[in-house]
C-alpha cells in the first residue's frame, strides 16, 4: 500500500501534542491590530488546542507528524 501524502499547509500550521491532541495558533493576529487591546493581542499569541471535530480531520492530513 502506498504512503499517504502529507498536506503541506497543514504540516506548517499544526503540531501534535504528546497525548495526540492537535495544537494550533489563534486567528485574528496578522493585521488591523490597532483597534485590538494589548490584552487581546497578548492572548492571541498563545496557542490553543483544536476542537475534537476538527482534530480528526487534521490528523488525517498530517499522518506522520
Swiss-Prot record:
It comes from the Bacteria. InterPro entries: Ribosomal_bL35, Ribosomal_bL35-like, Ribosomal_bL35_CS, Ribosomal_bL35_sf. It holds the Pfam family Ribosomal_L35p. Keywords: Ribonucleoprotein, Ribosomal protein. GO terms for cellular component: cytosolic large ribosomal subunit. The keyword Hydrolase does not apply. One of its GO terms (molecular function) is structural constituent of ribosome. The keyword Transferase does not apply. Belongs to the bacterial ribosomal protein bL35 family. PANTHER family: 54S RIBOSOMAL PROTEIN BL35M, LARGE RIBOSOMAL SUBUNIT PROTEIN BL35M. NCBIfam families: rpmI_bact. HAMAP family: Ribosomal_bL35. This is Large ribosomal subunit protein bL35. It comes from Acetivibrio thermocellus (strain ATCC 27405 / DSM 1237 / JCM 9322 / NBRC 103400 / NCIMB 10682 / NRRL B-4536 / VPI 7372) (Clostridium thermocellum). The lineage of its organism: Bacteria, Bacillati, Bacillota, Clostridia, Eubacteriales. The gene is rpmI.
